[in-house]
Amino acid sequence: MDIIRQWYLYWAVRPWEKWIIKRADCIVVTSPQYRDGSKPLQKVKEKIRIVPNAIDEKLFELRIGDKERIQEIRALYNGKPIVFFMGRHTKYKGLPHLIEAERYMKSDCVIVIGGKGPLTKRLKALAKKRNSARIHFVGRLSEDDLRCYLYAASVFAFPSVTKNEAFGVALAEAMYCYTPAVTFTIEGSGVNWVNLNGITGIEVSQKGNLNQVYAEALDKLVRDTSLQKEYSRAE
């Protein structure tokens, strides 16, 4: 992965990087976008092979008892559409954009945030400051509950904003469970290769008020169940 945030470290590792790239017989990347957006790889494209990340499909296949659990999850939120996030609570995941987007959302839905991380306390404080009853933190989930939450959700929120998010395995997991996603445009990242704008979900440009434009995209998908179905069944 390219060094994005700690850019000052790059000068220390750059000689090693050049040496390794020169010596390599094959360089594996997870998407064409990452290949084309990585400056060190531009002169060695003939060495590059694209091998996407994969998921364990068996973990996300519906099992006996899942339908009842999915209904239980929906009932927890009074049957309102669920906008679901699952991932580590770190800076590049862009979770403040999701939490701040809530103030602009006009649809009657809930935002359910799964996972934990170094920013969890700060994110909970931000949500508390919003004083909104529709933002819920559920922490780490078991494999069974994660699967059921993905099927229960109407929309999968994936608000990452930097190339540190190189692919988006969680996107693939959500899409396997027929849950369309809303992502940001991330230049040089495979995120927009996994979630295809207007085909499997909605891609939001990082221009203007990011919180507001993200909210508008979430609203559009939450309100349009026909569009949800169209995106979820795309091949």
Task: Label each PLM-derived region with a short phrase.
Residues 18, 22-59:
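A short, active-site helix/loop in glycosyltransferases that binds the activated sugar's phosphate group
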Residues 21, 140-141, 148-153:
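Short alpha-helical donor nucleotide-sugar binding micro-motif in glycosyltransferases
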Residues 72, 76-93, 99-103:
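Conserved donor-binding/catalytic core segment of Leloir-type glycosyltransferases
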Residues 80, 121-144, 203:
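Nucleotide-activated donor-binding/catalytic signature segment of Leloir-type glycosyltransferases, i.e.
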Residues 2-19, 65:
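Nucleotide-sugar donor phosphate/pyrophosphate-binding loop at the beta->alpha transition
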Residues 176-187:
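Short hydrophobic beta-strand element within catalytic cores of glycosyltransferases
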Residues 25, 151-166, 179:
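Acidic donor-binding loop of glycosyltransferase active sites
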